[in-house]
């Protein structure tokens, strides 16, 4: 226990020893956030918390790798199953575990970035004989992404389309979603 508290100031030690519920550590660069989190993880493991019940999320790959190395060094084999990820890695892992509940997707799905999405939209525009100058792929991708972020289904989007342009965007959205499913891919 004293090893996990060594070199910590009183506020940091309190954060490490608080084991009831989740904890959010927010502080400036170089303030010891990574040290506090790694010490807290080691402390939780020492208290008998199962590693798979611990989740630590960082922003960068570098921070995640550094934290993983520190936790492994402090806790050894007990740290193997701690969930320690970047935001993106955690979300991808979670999706891979749960994607089958959406129907039609396998856990080996691809995640389309903006370039992939725009290329797929360009393909759809060609299929529909629509001009890329009028139906700009980046703009269409943005519209689809916004609809998804607002949980607007293809059907709802289509019902709201009141003019020719938006009706075509709705048709593109529907084809886009169908092609994602066929390609076992997801996008934002």
For each feature predicted by the language model, list its residue ranges.
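A basic/glycine-biased coupling hinge at the interface between accessory DNA-binding modules
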Residues: 2, 20-21, 42-188
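Conserved RecA-like helicase ATPase core segment
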Residues: 2-7, 33, 37, 43
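Walker A/P-loop
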Residues: 20-39
